[in-house]
Regions:
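Extended amphipathic alpha-helical interaction segments
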Residues: 144-222
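Bacterial N-terminal signal peptides that target proteins for export
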Residues: 1-8
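A cross-kingdom marker for long, charged
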Residues: 217-267
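C-terminal motif of bacterial Sec signal peptides marking the signal peptidase cleavage site
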Residues: 15-18
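A structural signal for well-ordered alpha-helices, especially hydrophobic packing surfaces
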Residues: 114-117, 134-137, 141, 183-190, ...
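Non-transmembrane, amphipathic alpha-helical segments
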Residues: 94, 98-101, 105, 114, ...
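Bacterial signal peptide processing site
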Residues: 20-23
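N-terminal Sec/ER secretory leader and immediately downstream segment
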Residues: 26-143
Length: 267
């Protein structure tokens, strides 16, 4: 019921936006104050919508493949000998020129560090890269976190702090990067990582995608920096599984699209 209710809220919000967008202009003199009031009402409505989406998003757990997130992936000593070659190299921070890009790579590196831990790989370079990116970004919102490594969790606590500091768009950019990175990793060793999922976890991914796309779509209308993110996550719409079997099949079908989305977000 909870999931249906948020979908209903999203649909109602779309209807409201459509009505306000098509509303005839008032032809009376001195209507600037009226328009200003209407604009304030629209902006407040958008804020309420975004806050609602973030609250729901913050309740969702990370995909069950991450070591420090009570992940269910169990690797044998033999499996740990074959180190993953698909993780983002910590040196990628040198290619992060824009502020949005730095947020996205920070989120992805934090995810990859978790996978490196699972494979008993050294994480010194990840720690150094994450620390450097955090310093470059210099976001006071991160003070609410126990450590910057957990920024990818995109919690409600972090959202509130980033909202206060006027950085909501970066919150959703990190959320998009984190989700794409986790999906990408899952596609690189599907048989192993999919074993960590149950039907609830698979359905949770679908719900996460719906919330993320809704938020990004709304933001892209006001922030041109978010538009590329909207394009990057477009392929995720095909992921609507409610069972593990469906999730595995859909991941296999859109493996290349997920890799392409990752490339867009991390370049």
């Amino acid at each position: 019921m909870k999931k249906l209710s948020i979908f209903a809220v999203a649909l109602a919000a779309v209807a409201f936006a459509a009505c306000t967008g098509n509303k005839p202009q008032i032809e009376q003199n001195g209507t600037d104050s009226v328009k200003s009031f209407e604009q304030e009402q629209i902006e407040e409505n958008i804020k309420v919508q975004m806050d609602s989406l973030a609250a729901e998003f913050g309740k969702l757990k990370a995909l069950p493949i991450l070591k420090d997130q009570n992940g269910n992936v169990i690797l044998s000593d033999e499996e740990k000998q074959v180190k993953p070659d698909y993780l983002l190299n910590p040196s990628a921070i040198e290619d992060a020129i824009t502020l949005p890009g730095k947020y996205r790579i920070l989120s992805a590196l934090s995810i990859d560090k978790q996978i490196a831990i699972a494979y008993d790989m050294p994480t010194d370079e990840y720690d150094e890269a994450i620390a450097k990116l955090s310093a470059d970004i210099n976001d006071p919102s991160f003070k609410v976190l126990d450590n910057t490594d957990s920024a990818f969790e995109t919690s409600s606590k972090l959202y509130d702090a980033m909202e206060e500091n006027g950085r909501i768009n970066f919150f959703w950019q990190m959320a998009a990067s984190a989700l794409i990175e986790q999906l990408y990793i899952t596609t690189q060793n599907t048989d192993k990582f999919i074993a960590a999922f149950d039907d609830n976890a698979a359905e949770s991914v679908t719900y996460r995608i719906v919330l993320l796309q809704d938020a990004i779509e709304r933001l892209s209308a006001y922030d041109p920096e978010v538009k590329p993110i909207s394009d990057a996550i477009e392929p995720l719409k095909v992921l609507n599984a409610i069972t593990v079997d469906q999730f595995k099949s859909q991941l296999e079908e859109c493996k290349e699209q997920i890799a392409a989305s990752r490339k867009i977000l991390l370049n």
